[in-house]
């Protein structure tokens, strides 16, 4: 019998930003298929997410790490003695034109781009030893203008470019680097759209499939990218947007 390529039993997975939203869905996707999963989040303990919509830390290891701080990343404890899959699902966005100011711009870029590089470097050797995989969750905002959010758009475009560059640079070490670019998924980060019927309808009109994506669908793509099914994929970012960017 052929082994199940989506069986992650015994695999060690770290999901940065896995305490809520897409990252949380990805974390549970790997856990459901046998992986040992640890997540990094922003709150002091896992109990601080109890009863929080879009957050379920059942069965997941947890650490508080402020990925906007290079010192916090450098001093954070490694969750396992090795690592098979590193998922970057950290994200920040600021509204009311805060990203047009240096402080706001730099804050968003630190989380969405700089931390991706630093954390990937931090776990490079462990991933290389395991022949592991890095998955970077960016956004379709990387490929189109995002009015009012210059830092978000620029940082996500940078993340897509980083996937290509690290994919090429680290392929010979046995690490595969790929990414996912979702469109609108109903999470905490998209509440400004989801909580407004007018904005929701306007957004749906632009999506050929006429619905929003789900965290489970993003998890499915992550499971594919980290699996032997994608063993020859390197440096690619898959757009998962219901046809929005067509």
What do these predicted regions represent?
Residues 117, 211-240, 245:
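C-terminal substrate-recognition "lid" of short-chain dehydrogenase/reductases
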Residues 171, 176, 233-235:
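Short, small/polar-rich loop/turn modules that mediate ligand/substrate recognition or access, typified
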Residues 120, 155, 163:
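Active-site helix of classical SDR
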Residues 139:
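Residue(s) in the substrate-gating loop at a strand-loop-helix junction
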Residues 96-109, 203:
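Substrate-binding pocket helix/loop in short-chain dehydrogenase/reductase
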Residues 145-153, 165:
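Active-site loop-to-helix junction immediately N-terminal to the catalytic Tyr of the SDR YXXXK motif
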Residues 19-20:
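Conserved glycine-rich cofactor-binding loop
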């Amino acid at each position: 019998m052929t082994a199940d390529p989506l069986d992650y039993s015994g695999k060690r997975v770290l999901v940065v930003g896995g305490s809520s939203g897409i990252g949380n869905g990805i974390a549970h996707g790997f856990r459901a298929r046998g992986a040992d999963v640890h997540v990094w989040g922003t709150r002091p303990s896992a109990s601080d997410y109890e009863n929080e919509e879009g957050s379920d830390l059942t069965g997941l290891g947890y650490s508080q790490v402020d990925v906007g701080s290079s010192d916090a990343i450098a001093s954070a404890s490694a969750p396992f003695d090795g690592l098979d899959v590193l998922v970057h699902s950290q994200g920040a966005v600021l509204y009311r034109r805060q990203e047009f100011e240096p402080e706001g711009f730099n804050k968003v870029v630190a989380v969405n781009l700089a931390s991706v590089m630093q954390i990937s470097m931090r776990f490079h050797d462990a991933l290389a030893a395991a022949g592991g995989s890095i998955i970077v969750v960016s956004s379709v905002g990387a490929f189109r203008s995002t009015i009012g959010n210059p830092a978000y758009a620029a940082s996500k475009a940078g993340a897509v470019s980083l996937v290509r560059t690290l994919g090429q640079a680290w392929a010979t070490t046995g690490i595969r680097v790929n990414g996912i670019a979702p469109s609108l998924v109903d999470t905490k980060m998209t509440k400004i759209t989801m909580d407004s019927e007018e904005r929701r309808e306007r957004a749906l009109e632009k999506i050929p499939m006429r619905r929003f994506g789900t965290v489970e669908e993003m998890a499915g793509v992550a499971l594919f990218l980290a699996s032997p099914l994608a063993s020859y994929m390197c440096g690619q970012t898959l757009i998962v947007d219901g046809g929005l960017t067509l």
